[in-house]
Amino acid sequence: MGGYGVMADEESLDYSVHEAWNEATNVYLLVILVSFALLMYARKNKRKIMRIFTLPPTVGSSSEPNFYDSLQKVRLRQQLEMYSLARKYDQQQSQSESVQLSME
């Protein structure tokens, strides 16, 4: 009769406790079934779900590439200016050398 001691204790418990346990197990069962259904849906529609996460960047986040593009343009412009200044300096040097040669 040792095995029936637990049953005797359950009979003495209030009915609301049994109802609470039933509701709790129903909720757990429902959560498991919904999770399983979502898993099956995800397997079936994997491409649709991945398309959501690979959307093109919004206008707010596109300012960073523009910033870096403008930085590269500024650097390119600086390099071109330095190159043109160096060419002008070289041309002036060669002109002054030719003038000195013609004077001699």
Curated annotation (Swiss-Prot):
GO terms for cellular component: membrane. It comes from the Eukaryota. PANTHER family: SMALL INTEGRAL MEMBRANE PROTEIN 19 (PTHR31888:SF1). The keyword Membrane applies. The chain crosses the membrane at residues 20-42. Keywords: Membrane, Transmembrane, Transmembrane helix. Signal peptide: none annotated. It is a single-pass membrane protein. Pfam families: UPF0697 (PF15117). InterPro entries: SMIM19. It is found in: Membrane. Belongs to the SMIM19 family. This is Small integral membrane protein 19.
